[in-house]
Amino acid sequence: MEERIRLSILLDIYGELLTEKQRNVLDLYYNQDLSLAEIAEHTSTSRQAVYDIIKRCHMLLVHYEDKLNLMEEKKNIEENKKGIIDFIDSLYSDKNAEVLDKIKNYIMNNI
């Protein structure tokens, strides 16, 4: 996975663990694709301060994922959910279609 996309996902997962300013800077950098100079102008800080925040938070987000593995867990859950849905699709017949649709909808919406 491209590092920029990975960091954007980590920001979504662990963003609440950062300060509001850190979240804002990272959102502008990773999700809005602004340059360091644009972020500095937008936040009324220096380009160097923006760079430092991004580097520090990058390390923090990677550290959180190394310890908690929430992104990996989410990926595994989605893969397992897809496997279950594929299995349910293989069981379809005219007699059980309604029940299987209810099971699929429950899995897709609640797990």
UniProtKB/Swiss-Prot annotation:
Family from the record: Belongs to the UPF0122 family.
Function comment: Might take part in the signal recognition particle (SRP) pathway. This is inferred from the conservation of its genetic proximity to ftsY/ffh. May be a regulatory protein.
Domain of life: Bacteria
Signal sequence, renumbered to the chain: none
Gene3D superfamilies named in the record: Winged helix-like DNA-binding domain superfamily/Winged helix DNA-binding domain (1.10.10.10)
Taxonomic placement: Bacteria, Bacillati, Bacillota, Clostridia, Eubacteriales
Family annotation (InterPro entries): RNA_pol_sigma_r3/r4-like, UPF0122, UPF0122_fam_protein, WH-like_DNA-bd_sf
SUPFAM superfamilies: Sigma3 and sigma4 domains of RNA polymerase sigma factors
The protein's name in its UniProt record: UPF0122 protein CKL_1400
